[in-house]
Amino acid sequence: MINHDEWLIVGLITSPQGINGKIKVKSLSDFEERFTKPGIRWIQKETESPKKLQLISGFQKPGKESFVITFKEIKNRNEAEKLKGYKLLVKVDEIPKLNKNEFHLTELMNLKVKILENNKLKIIGKVVNLENEKNNLLVIKLLTNDKEVLVPFVKEIIPEIDIKNKFLIITPPPGLLEL
């Protein structure tokens, strides 16, 4: 299990790329250098301890939020295939400092989702995932029916985020939560 007090998930290893051990990573970060600048990186499968690897190189796929990276220790496609599903991590103490009211997307995970109903805030679900290949979308699991809905991550729909108190408020347009 990932200790979110120590680690921040910045990418998801999705597949091998080619036959020479290159790996495709879906980015959950705004900091491109995490995938392109050589140095130590950490990967983890959900139930294992983080493993240290040496990033040699990486580049962003044109028009995508994914990168192709090369680790020194991964020599071929078979080794790369074994890393599918691993998370790319950074230590929390190595996270760049953000300005006030800024946060890392992964900090939205497990936040309670509230909606204003009859002038009172009501919890309707929680953030269970992020979809960000083309647009940033929050996957929200509703309490009423366990259904998952996609909510665009835009200020008009999500006007308030309170990381410290672990909730966000949404103002969905009619029908969004019924899709």
Swiss-Prot record:
Q: Which SUPFAM superfamilies match?
A: PRC-barrel domain, Translation proteins
Q: Name one GO biological process term.
A: ribosomal small subunit biogenesis
The listed locations are: Cytoplasm
One cellular-component annotation, GO: ribosome
Domain PRC barrel residue range list: 100-176
Entry's HAMAP family? Ribosome_mat_RimM (MF_00014)
Supply the domain comment: The PRC barrel domain binds ribosomal protein uS19.
Q: Quaternary form?
A: Binds ribosomal protein uS19.
| Name of the protein this chain belongs to | Ribosome maturation factor RimM
In its UniProt entry, the species of origin is given as Prochlorococcus marinus (strain MIT 9515)
Q: Which gene encodes it?
A: rimM
